[in-house]
Amino acid sequence: MGSTKPRPSGKNSISHAQSLPGKTFIIDNGAYNMKAGYAPDSQPLDDEEIALSACAAIPNAIVKTRANRTYVGAQIGTNVTDWNEMLFRRPVEKGYTVNWEAQKEIWENSFFDERTVRSKELHIADPEDVTIIFTEAPNALPALQKNADEIIMEEWGFGGYLRCVVGMAKPFALNTGPSLNAWNEIQSLFEDSVLSQPRAVASPAECLLVVDSGYSHTVITPVYRGRPLQRGIRRLDLGGKHLTNYLKELVSMRQYNMVDETYIMNEVKESVCFVSNDFNRDLERTWKGNRKRGQPDPTDGVVVDYVLPDPNGGKRGFMRPHDPLLGSKKRKAVLAGASAEQLNEDVLVLGNERFTVPEILFTPSDIGMKSAGIPDIILQSLSVLPTGLHPAFLANVLVVGGNSLLPGFMERLETELRQIASAECVVRVRRPKDPIRFAWLGGSRLATNKEELKKVAITRQEYQEHGSSWTTRKFSGAL
């Protein structure tokens, strides 16, 4: 493991006042990918694509290949060619950073070491000249929060710091990772044209119900004027990781043993899975769609083929329409003297696995979990809030996280919410263009509002004077 270099702490004296550094670096520290980059120096950029060009998605993991080579962070996406039997070490578990030794190595490799940083736009040359915005999942344990504060402010010595947390001391906490989404231009997503005019100073949406379905879990966060309502936060311990593991189990029981092929099966999931809006109909199509023997029917059937990657041939995996005659074609090819390369093709035939795997997000009881699905948990979240706020939140449901990209996810969520919500409420469910980096984008807009950032962030001087316990109270809204 690479050593983390201690950062100098004597540059700024505690004896005189210190303001937040001008540069702000945001790290949305996800369990699967980190979303990181510098915020713009002045007013927020109106063009979302240009603003997101400053944000890089970096694997938050250390991997070991079957050739016993180790890759860290950004190296994974550029240097790895053989994904078979890849071993992953992730510092974030269940949404919380629990292994700071691994996390420090990934950060050092991705942001501090000039030799390994992907680009100069991600390089942090002197942390004392940078304010860092660091996100974490709601309701983290105090010990984990303290670890983050001490490592970021004492080992690296950043000049300014904001840890986006949910506070327990007040019903309106300062910030959470999900609440950063409220700082984006939400109105245009919900067709509120009167309110969607460009603003010189970034400000949060008034009412927003954030559904964050990511790698480790799904979290429902009601956000009021940029601040999360603590008692309304609900969590479903199902995320993309669980979908991948479930798909691995199903495929391993029915076809090849894919238990050790986590990365490959994650690629399969992202390529072929979808959320069914008529489960019984799709289940019937699975076994009836290709019932005419010898005649492939890709238009009616749900069944598809996924060709597994071939690292020796430098080929990536891909999905294609199911060919029920594939076996007989291969036998004929052998008789015709086809080359080994043409025949050496491993194929997964996927039918009901395509939609039964994502179905657990809506009916966790399918895998024995005694929990409600996402739509019911949204209603549970609203049930503890004033009734007068329900229409505003249901009319502004924002879905972020990688699972929202599954085809059919948005339609299914909106349909089920309409069925169980009050008839008087208008239900609008929207997803931004980039649901994975949307929280980072909100953080960058917050960073351009210098006055608001001063209220919620702390300086290095304040940390040195008051310590970690004071920092925890500050970020929890107790000060």
UniProtKB/Swiss-Prot annotation:
Its main location: cytoplasm. InterPro entries: Actin, ATPase_NBD. It comes from the Eukaryota. GO terms for biological process: chromatin remodeling. Pfam families: Actin. It is found in: Cytoplasm; Cytoplasm, Cytoskeleton; Nucleus. One of its GO terms (cellular component) is cytoskeleton. The keyword Ubl conjugation does not apply. Keywords: Activator, Chromatin regulator, Cytoplasm, Cytoskeleton, Nucleus, Transcription, Transcription regulation. One of its GO terms (molecular function) is nucleosome binding. Belongs to the actin family. ARP6 subfamily. PANTHER family: ACTIN (PTHR11937). Component of the SWR1 complex which mediates the ATP-dependent exchange of histone H2A for the H2A variant HZT1 leading to transcriptional regulation of selected genes by chromatin remodeling. Involved in chromosome stability. Component of the SWR1 chromatin remodeling complex. This is Actin-like protein arp6.
